[in-house]
């Protein structure tokens, strides 16, 4: 007796294709790597830099040098996990009108011997439908 293999071939191919997917796509809520040039990552990084400067007791602004690594997680919205390098600028903070991200990025750096670089990890929670971003975690050294 000969049995047809056709009905089994389709589901078998589908199973093989699913097994070859990256593991992050198979875990709901898992971390996924993101390109540091992704517009959503850039927006989260800008927000993180502004929040860092608002919360920091330092008398000078720090600007973004580069995003070292970016990951995201689907939660109620998106959570971005960013590793970034920040550098102390020559721009002093003044009371009244804090600088926005683009202004901070235009600040000059001090001479090489006086430069202070920070390695920071930020978690930014984005909920676009509420037009809200929140810095949920920050650590720099």
Curated annotation (Swiss-Prot):
Keywords: Disulfide bond, Protease inhibitor, Secreted, Signal, Thiol protease inhibitor
Site location (Reactive site): 29
Cystine bridges: 91-107, 120-140
Subcellular location: Secreted
Tissue specificity comment: Expressed at a low level by the venom gland (at protein level).
Domain Cystatin: 29-129
Stretch forming the signal peptide: 1-26
Family annotation (Gene3D superfamilies): 3.10.450.10
GO cellular component: extracellular exosome
Role this protein plays: Inhibits various C1 cysteine proteases including cathepsin L, papain and cathepsin B. This protein has no toxic activity and its function in the venom is unknown. It may play a role as a housekeeping or regulatory protein.
UniProt similarity note: Belongs to the cystatin family.
Note: Negative results: the recombinant protein does not inhibit calpain-1 (CAPN1), a C2 family cysteine protease and legumain (LGMN), a C13 family cysteine protease. Does not provoke cell death (PC3 prostrate cancer cells).
Name of the protein described by the UniProt record: Cystatin
């Amino acid at each position: 007796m000969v049995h047809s293999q056709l009905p089994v071939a389709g589901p078998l191919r589908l199973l093989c294709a699913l097994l070859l997917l990256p593991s992050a796509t198979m875990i709901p809520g898992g971390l996924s790597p993101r390109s540091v040039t992704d517009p959503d990552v850039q927006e989260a990084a800008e927000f993180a830099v502004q929040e860092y400067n608002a919360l920091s007791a330092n008398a000078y602004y720090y600007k973004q040098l580069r995003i070292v690594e970016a990951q995201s997680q689907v939660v109620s919205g998106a959570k971005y996990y960013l590793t970034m390098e920040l550098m102390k600028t020559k721009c002093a903070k003044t009371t009244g009108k804090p600088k926005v991200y683009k202004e901070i990025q235009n600040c000059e750096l001090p001479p090489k011997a006086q430069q202070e670089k920070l390695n920071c990890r930020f978690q930014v929670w984005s909920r676009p439908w509420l037009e809200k971003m929140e810095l949920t975690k920050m650590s720099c050294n």
